[in-house]
Each structure stands twice: as structure tokens, then as C-alpha cells.
Amino acid sequence: MSSSFLTSKVIPQISITLPPSKSLYNRLFVMARLAHRPIPSLWHQLDLCEDLAVTLHASGSSEECISVGASGTAMRLLTALFALTTEREVLLVSPVRRMTERPLAQLIALLTQLGADLAQPASQEPVEGLYPLVRIRPTSLQQKGLPTLTLPSGLESSQTVTALLLIAPYLPHGLVLRWQDDQLPSASYIQLTCSLMQACGIDLSVDRHGIYVAPGAYCEATLTRLLSHPIGDWSSAQYPLQWALMAPHPCQLLLTNVPAQSLQPDARALDLLQISSEWLSTSDDTLCLDSEFLQKHLRELTFGSLSLSNNPDFAPTLIALLLYYQKKAQLRGLDLLRLKESDRIALILRNGEQLGYQLTYETESGFCLAGSAPSSVHTPVPIATDADHRMVMAWAPFAWYHQLQIETPQAVEKSYPTFWRDLRKLCEVIETPLYI
């Protein structure tokens, strides 16, 4: 850490170990299954978030009816995996109605072009509390030549591309994906997929409007190495960063398993806040978040127009921060937030207004934050979440300043199961309660 951080006074400090990266290990679990490589036993001993636990269990399941919980990632990646590999009929289901509305139809259509036998059930009414999502039948994805798929305009999820890329080396002739749009949604996550595949020995090439994947197999030794030392989740690290930036008293948070330099696209949260990773690094795998330094830094910043098309999951947290700091800003590239675990656009507007802030949303211009001081609020302030984990976590720090009534606080289990434990640990050391 830079010497400018050093101070003679004692600052309350806590250490946090974040859950393993969802973006890395959801992909690596599927790659390991395709390579017929056992997942190291340590993964079965970890307290995983729901997203990773679903993919870990379901990707190796021999059951005919498999629940993907509330995980859109698992739903899409497993759909492609089973379309290629299953030797039995598989039905993916979910106990969550919202999952029937999440993006999947585009992936099904593209897999069908490759010869897969799969379809969404005609009725998506629940059976014994489970909503049917997609039925997959065994077939052989044999092609006479190199298949070329053209992605539909208005792609709803980058995971459609990731799902196809992950299985592409195991198609007889590989795969070409083409697209017409100038920019794919969450392109940084597609780049992550390509980087992991290349690290595991796959030959692929990318140009402005397409990706070619040669037939091949994932390197088992590389997969074993990548799966042997779990790396912390940058999409979870945004929340301790937010705590440091909103904490009512000085503190330091040590994130013990998050490298500053990471393939994870969510690490770009630092760039969006104009924070250099060099300011935070104490070792290869530890970040130190100093609240006094970070708060001073953010108070001095101005924000104009930002594109979050590559980092949509950071939008709720960033908006909450900018509202708290009364920053005027425009945030673009977020139309697909309506298709997430909730309609995040509607909930961000609702919760921001409940907390007394002025903000609007237009399709062309995105979110516009007025940058004004909040009006007075009536407590307890209701925070609507629709069981969306990111809606719970993004607004929780306001409980230092208002009595909040947060819906479904347990939704954090989906991605950051120790969220409340870690936040309350911070509350103890700074001797400030949460008003929840």
C-alpha cells in the first residue's frame, strides 16, 4: 500500500473472505464436465453461493428433473451442456416463477440450428411447486461442415454466446458465431469466456463481428490448476467497497482473496469509480479498502455520462453510491436490466425515490441522477427487492442512516451468502448499528 495511506491513529479493521467467483467457476465447472475431469473435492466442502452450488451439482447430475433454483446462468449454461452431452431426457425446472421470464428462447433456437432436440414446454404452469423451463432430449450434434450461427439482433443475454462457446470445441467441426450488432451485451463477459478457453488450450479467433472456435478439448491439467485455488468474487467485492464508501466512521476492510488484477469483468468497478488498483493492493491476493481515503476521493469526483453496458450488475450499487454522494450523472447501456432477477430499472427508480432522491430513466438516455440533496423520508423506508439479491445488497448501507424495511433479505444467498454476517461484523468494529 502507498505510504500516503499510513496514519498514526488506530483505525477499526476487519478481514473478509469473499465467496468464489461466479463468473470464473460457473464456466470452469462446465468446461471440466465436458473434459470429463472430476471437480476437485474441495469444492464440495466450501459454503458456496446458490449460483455455483446449482452448477456444481446439476452439471454432474444423472437425474431427469433438475432444479436450477433462481440461477439464470446455470439455466443457460446447463441447457447447452445437456444439449450436447445428455444420454437421457432432461427437464430443467425452477421453484421461482421469474425464471420462466428470463432469457432462454434465443439460446434454444440457436442450439436447435445445431441439431439439438430441445424446447420450452407448452405450459409453464408449476408442477409440485416447480416451473418447467426447458426439456432436452438426447441427440447427436453432427454437422457435415463447419456450422455458422448468426446471433439475433437485440441479443438478450451474453450468456447465450458463452453457452455456445463453451460447447463449441466438442462439436465435430467447431463453430463460427457471427453477429451484426456493433456491440454485444456484456461483451467483457464473452471475452472472459474466450480467455478461459484459450488458457485451456482451445484455438479460437475473434474479430469485430464474429468468433471462430476450432474443434479440440480442454486441457485437463490446466483445468485442475484453475480449480485448485478458488479466487474471490469481484461481483461480491463491490459491496465491501460500497460499505467503505458509505461507512459513517473510519474503517479499513481487508479483502483477503481478491486479486486487484483479474479477468473478472466486475473488477472494472474500480475504473468506473476512478480508483487505481495500486492504491488498494497490499499483496497479490489482498485489497485494503480505507474508508477515509476512498470517501475523500469520491467526494472530489464529478461524473458525466457513463456506459455500463459491460458491467450491468454494478449498476444498482453505483447508482446507490451516486445518490448518497449527491452526484449528477447519466448512466447508459442498461436496458437489459429489465430482464434480470427482477425488473431492476423499476426497482432502482422506486427505491431511490423512497429514499428521497430524484432520478429518472429513459430508454435513449438511461438513468439520469439529479445530484440534489434527498427530501425527507418517512421511516421505516420500504425497500422493494422482488427477491433480487442485488436489490437487497445495493440498498442495505442506507440502513446506517435510515430505518429500512428490506424485502427478502435472505436473497443474498444467491451470490454472497455471508453478506449480512460480514456487514454486521463491520458494524461491530465501527460501533454503529444497522437500522433494519
Q: What annotation goes with each model-predicted range?
A:
Residues 1-436:
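Short, structured segments at the rim of ligand-binding sites
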